[in-house]
Amino acid sequence: MVVARRARRPLAASTANHSRPRILVVQSCPVTPAGIVGQVAEARADVATIFPHGGEPLPRTTAGLDGLIILGGPMHAGDDVNCPAFRALLPLIRRCHAQGKPVFGICLGAQLIARAFGKPVYPYGGVEVGYLPVQLTEAAAEDRLLAGLAIEQHIMQMHEDSFDLPDGAVLLMRNDTCANQAFRLGATTYGFQFHLEVTEADAGNFPRDCWAALQRHFGSAAEAEEARVLAEVERHFAEGETFCRTVTARWLDLVEEARAERRRRAA
């Protein structure tokens, strides 16, 4: 699957004369677009997508930026040799967090948030793939993004790595296979290990997009695993889409609130 690049809109200028928030999407891989998260965000914000591993530079400051979304990809979050753009992305994550500009990390994006705050990212010893059950923790009941949602959700997974939680982070979702599934750091920085963003078409393409990982872990059973995943897409996609749209909309509430507060202070 090839995803066409969007025209990049500059984010360096002040947001003072713009009626909608500005959100930067960092896309590391063409087969992991913003999907449903992007659809929800574009309805309420001006969204610019950049491809840093294709040579597009990341902004050096957060000027003109109201929120940051970091998407997934097959690369390892610690691979600065093959992914040198990570060196510029980590300080951008820290700056957004320090300034109260909401951050939303998906899979690799969540791992990069953990790394930005000094925590290791590592192979957890297996692979999670398919619409697998994930449980909300008790802390999620008081969280702005997750309060009131069903305790168990089935959401698309495709990862081999995990991470340690940043100091002070609150664990919001977990499962028995890989404990750290979702967390909040501070009030507005969120990491999600799973792929809540996938459209139905992208979810159906995941097994082939990640075929090498399936063969590595399942060998001759890889085709059976592919069939399982495709059946789970049909069974659980609607549930996952509802979860994604709800969580993304609530995160955008945080973006709008933080932006309004900055404008109030600057007035």
Predicted feature residues:
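Cysteine-nucleophile active-site neighborhood
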Residues: 70-140
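Pocket-forming structural segment of enzyme catalytic cores
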Residues: 117-203
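C-terminal helical/coil "lid" or tail adjacent to the Rossmann-like core of SAM-dependent
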Residues: 188, 193, 197-233
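Short loop/helix-cap segments at secondary-structure boundaries that form the rim of catalytic
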Residues: 38, 58-63, 113-114, 164-166, ...
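Tryptophan-centric aromatic hotspots in well-structured domains and transmembrane helices
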Residues: 40-41, 131-133, 158, 206, ...
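Hydrophobic/aromatic beta-strand patches that form the interior of the parallel beta-sheet core
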Residues: 24, 50, 69, 104, ...
